[in-house]
Amino acid sequence: MSDTLISMDYRFVDILNANQLEVGDLIGLGIVGIVKIISIAPMKDGFLLVIENEFNEEEDVEILDDEKFEFFILE
């Protein structure tokens, strides 16, 4: 039986506004890098995101309504 290493790369797809984000999206988030959105909750001036980084660590991040984010897919 042979072992196969599968390499997956992120591919930039689009720029999304904060109100276009969905649970499960992979977005670029500043110096943190590419993260997965776990949950989204509306706030007065934006949204509260729970994100997961490449080490499976979760973190809360507040974003504003007018922010834009790079959207990625795995291929």
Sequence positions of predicted segments:
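Mixed-charge, Lys/Arg-rich low-complexity intrinsically disordered regions
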Residues: M1-V23
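Generic detector of N-terminal low-structure segments
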Residues: D14, L49, F71-L74
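Short, hydrophobic/aromatic-rich segments at coil-to-beta transitions
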Residues: E22-D25, F47-L48
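Intrinsic disorder/low-complexity segments
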Residues: A18-Q20, P42, K68
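Intrinsically disordered, low-complexity, charged/polar segments
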Residues: S2-M8, E58-E75
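Basic/aromatic-rich interaction segments and small domains that mediate binding to polyanionic partners
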Residues: I34-E62
